[in-house]
Amino acid sequence: MREFLVIGLAAGIILILWKSRLNYLLLPSLPVSAGKDPLDLTVIIPARNEAHQIARAVQSFPGLPVIVVDDASSDETAHAARAAGAQVISPPPLSPGQKGKPTACAEGARYATTKWLLFVDADTWFDSPFAASIVAYAEGAGVPFVTAFLEQRCQSLAEKALLPYAFALYFTGVSARAVNNPTSHQALANGQCILFERAVYESIGGHAAVEESVIEDVALARHAKQKGVPVRVMRAEHLGHVRMYDGFAAIWRGFQKNSFRFLVINPWSGLQVILASILLTSWLPVLILGLADYPKPSGAMLLAPTPVAILFLAPLLSLLPWYRGWRVILAPSAIYGFQLIALNGMFTTLTRRATLWKGRRV
């Protein structure tokens, strides 16, 4: 009986992680294009306490108008952005319920006059063909809302361990076909990189329509689809890069703020993520249970052609594409470490506790 449990769990883990990777790879890859010159595009960067990295984001777009919306920073963000060549503006004070990022994005859009608006985060940077490529794709495909996932750059051990697993888990609940299907209710966007045709953006209310949402990117995509606006979710790891968090404390706060809210805003996706998480966290207990069937278990057994060996290797081999090499040995710690982070996020959301994020309670 235990052997069937071990084999069944191994098969389930392989299947769910294979599905996750396939969901990601089925997102279309952004083609590299020279595009038109000059581009009818304004780049908008909401920024709060980003003095250490805002210049890199601004300088990714030479020759293009860049608006940095300085969201009441307490550091030298505004000075660094101006020095890098950006126009710097400030949003109005937040009203009760408003969130900083969507309000900043909405204010930046008010100052833009171009056909296209490109919203990017301050912790992103892009290769020179990116802007032309994403505009050329949007115009060629006739899609007014294009969002792209970027290459995740990880430096600390916590980032290298936790973030690849977090994305693998995230995509267990994402259907690439559904998010890019105008008739599907499933919506997805990556707020690190959103291109929007300004006339369409304004016609549906833009970020102001989701100004009370902490996960404004998914809320904006859902709002757009409800208004009949087609959304295209893509991959652009070859042209865009991001370092989301700079260590464990930032990861903890970031997912405390976002993780459970994503599950709530996309219930079907959330259910799949929860089931995948339960399956994966069953790995170690069932592995120990399987080893109990052997009178003298040893490490060598985990590499022999046995059911427990298959279970032992199932998450490691299945997560290998997300970790890209030796870092996959960190995956077991991520399976259980991220579970604690997710449970903390759920507790924080359900009890309506605030998260301190960049000096502001959200």
Report residues per predicted region:
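Short aromatic/hydrophobic "clamp" motif used to bind/position activated sugar donors
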Residues: 117
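Membrane-embedded multi-pass helical conduit in multi-pass membrane proteins
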Residues: 273, 277-352
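Acidic donor-binding/catalytic loop of UDP-sugar-dependent glycosyltransferases
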Residues: 76, 122-137
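Short, well-formed alpha-helical segments that are part of the catalytic scaffolds
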Residues: 21-31, 50-63
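Acidic helix N-cap motif at the loop->helix transition within catalytic regions
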Residues: 52-56, 75-84
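A conserved acidic beta->alpha catalytic loop
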Residues: 70-79, 93
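N-terminal membrane-anchoring/stem segments of glycan-assembly enzymes
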Residues: 1-37, 163-164, 176
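Catalytic donor/gating beta->alpha subdomain of glycosyltransferases that bind UDP-sugars
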Residues: 138, 145-170, 199-202, 207-269, ...
